A protein has these predicted regions:
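Terminal, non-globular segments
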Residues: 1-177
Length: 177
């Protein structure tokens, strides 16, 4: 029951982030660029959630995001899957208690995910390659995501610890003889 409540909470957070991304940060852009809050969500799910559940949840969130606002189904699902997998891989080598480490992981995952999404859009939509515009957008998005992580990290860490405790409950039952 706790796991179902936690998954429902994740989906509620997803819809809140969708509202923030589309309405609030649509007004507060930096040079016309909005942060990608979904990469941050997928990264933190990869860091704190059980590695068995994370790919499925992030793929489902990505498909929902594709249905809501994308012209190609599957790109956001792949992007969020890559971000969550990056979080799973990085957590083996780094501590999730360090804010600087999380910021560096976020910078790397934002760059990798946006690069993959850009390449997939070029392949599928056959658009022109604009390297300078891409690097301008990605650098502003990285700065924006990093600032949001700096500000929201205590809240995210508290939620992440709750999720982690929910999905990694001790299954040990002691017997007294």
């Amino acid at each position: 029951m706790k796991k179902a409540f936690a998954i429902i909470t994740i989906f509620i957070i997803f819809f809140c982030l969708y509202f923030l991304q589309s309405k609030v940060f649509g007004v507060f852009t930096i040079a016309g660029v909005k942060p990608n809050l979904f990469i941050v969500l997928a990264l933190f799910l990869g860091l704190f959630l059980n590695k068995m559940y994370t790919p499925f949840i992030c793929s489902a969130l990505g498909l929902l995001l594709d249905f809501f606002c994308s012209d190609i189904i599957g790109i956001n699902a792949i992007m969020l899957l890559v971000a969550s997998t990056g979080g799973i891989l990085f957590i083996k080598n780094f501590s999730k208690e360090s804010r600087i480490t999380i910021m560096m992981i976020s910078i790397a995952m934002t760059f990798i995910c946006e690069l993959i999404a850009y390449i997939l859009r070029i392949i599928v939509l056959e658009t022109n390659i604009e390297i300078l515009a891409f690097f301008k957008v990605i650098s502003i998005e990285i700065i924006y995501n990093t600032i949001l992580i700096i500000v929201l990290y205590p809240l995210i860490q508290k939620f992440g610890n709750w999720i982690e405790n929910t999905f990694t409950e001790d299954k040990i039952r002691t017997k007294y003889f």
